[in-house]
């Protein structure tokens, strides 16, 4: 009696057209101007595997994002005021 080796499946994973696109979170961080501090957090976490040892990097990233959010709020407020002044 001969035993045949089962063939593997021939399924193929559908290729997404957006595979080449950058992750939306990475895009957001890059646009914020905080990519360098985010990278520092990632690098520290990869090295230490313990977020507690990365608190200076985490705090720097938090400060950068907070400043960016404050700038964004101010910009939105200015646009809102300009729009209401035109009406």
From Swiss-Prot:
What family is this?
Belongs to the COA4 family.
Q: Supply the gene name.
A: COA4
Q: What is its main location?
A: mitochondrion
Q: Where is this motif: Cx9C motif 2?
A: 54-64
Q: Which domain of life is it from?
A: Eukaryota
Question: Ranges for the CHCH domain?
Answer: 31-72
* Bias-annotated ranges (Polar residues): 1-10
Sum up the protein's function in the record's words. Putative COX assembly factor.
**What keyword terms does UniProt attach to this protein?**
Disulfide bond, Mitochondrion
The alphabetized list of GO BP terms reads: mitochondrial cytochrome c oxidase assembly
- Tell me where the sequence motif Cx9C motif 1 sits in this chain: 34-44
Q: What is this protein called?
A: Cytochrome c oxidase assembly factor 4 homolog, mitochondrial
Which stretches are tagged as biased composition: Basic and acidic residues? 71-87
Cellular component GO terms held in the UniProt record: mitochondrial intermembrane space; mitochondrion
Q: List the disulfide bonds.
A: 34-64, 44-54
List where in the cell it is found: Mitochondrion
Region Disordered, annotated ranges: 1-24, 68-87
Organism from which the protein derives: Mus musculus
Q: What InterPro entries is this protein classified in? A: CHCH, Coa4-like
